[in-house]
Amino acid sequence: MPSFDVVSELDKHEVTNAIDNAIKELDRRYDLRGKGSFEQKDLTVQLTAEAEFQLEQMLEILKLSLVKRKIDIQCLEVKDAYASGKTMKQEAVLREGIDKELAKKIVAHIKDAKLKVQAAIQGEQVRVTGKKRDDLQEAIALLRGHEFGMPLQFNNFRD
């Protein structure tokens, strides 16, 4: 029986490259040179600057470098800025994986479309099975056309 998996994954190497590019861009910008920094810890990026408007500029630099590396910025969750002594700090978390709520939304969306496929939640992914390959391709087109707030990838397509 043909099937595929719906996942939300990030290429960690590309994320690291994007953050490195953002650091280089920060050094090139005259208005931000020496006034801010990016620190990466796994999938969390901490932005540090002297003022809040500089944090906003740095966040734009980070978003642009992620887009250049073909990383969807929907997975970027930006937290509120806070003061730490004389500096301002802000965290940006790159989300990965499909949580239970999003998985339920995906399954409900597939069921509401009344396609001839079944969707099942398996941890951080959703497995979609059907009798025909065409039904699965319809399900992929349906999911691509809907906005879930997270980038979705489709892998493990089996006949």
Curated annotation (Swiss-Prot):
One of its GO terms (molecular function) is nucleotide binding. Gene3D superfamilies: 3.30.70.860, YajQ-like, domain 2 (3.30.70.990). It comes from the Bacteria. InterPro entries: DUF520, UPF0234-like_C, UPF0234_N, YajQ-like_sf. CDD domains: YajQ_like. Keywords: Nucleotide-binding. Transmembrane segments: none annotated. It holds the Pfam family DUF520. GO terms for cellular component: cytosol. Nucleotide-binding protein. Belongs to the YajQ family. This is Nucleotide-binding protein PST_3153.
